[in-house]
Amino acid sequence: KYLAFAHKADQENKPYAARIFRAAAEAETIHAHAHLRAMGGIGNTEDNLKEAIGGETYEFTDMYPPMMVDAENEGEKSAYRSMNLANEAEKVHAEMFKKALADPAKTPPKVYLCKVCGHIHEENIPDVCPICGSKSHVYIEME
């Protein structure tokens, strides 16, 4: 959330607040990595890919569907759309992790990320995001 807060502060021309929010976001990442290491939660790449597949699969099979039902029942269209887009993106993420697990050392293709919904696409940028319908200009290349 701190990165979203930083973006808003940038929009409001409040650079000090934006910088502090970005620093706090990075600090939280440092904390998460430290906690994960302390719990022995970082295995070898194959184990980490299996963990990632399990996590993404849980999200699109068990986590998001009931949340989407609740949002729909409560008439929260924006919340429903957000969760539905994330749910669809998680399916793609799980498939990508499966592909990486099959050959983790291969030369990676170009990978692009839709900044609207989180869809990941390999090789080239689609004209339109298959999940959210955004135009190609919203994609960024990942290193």
Predicted feature descriptions by range:
Residues 1-143:
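Non-heme di-metal
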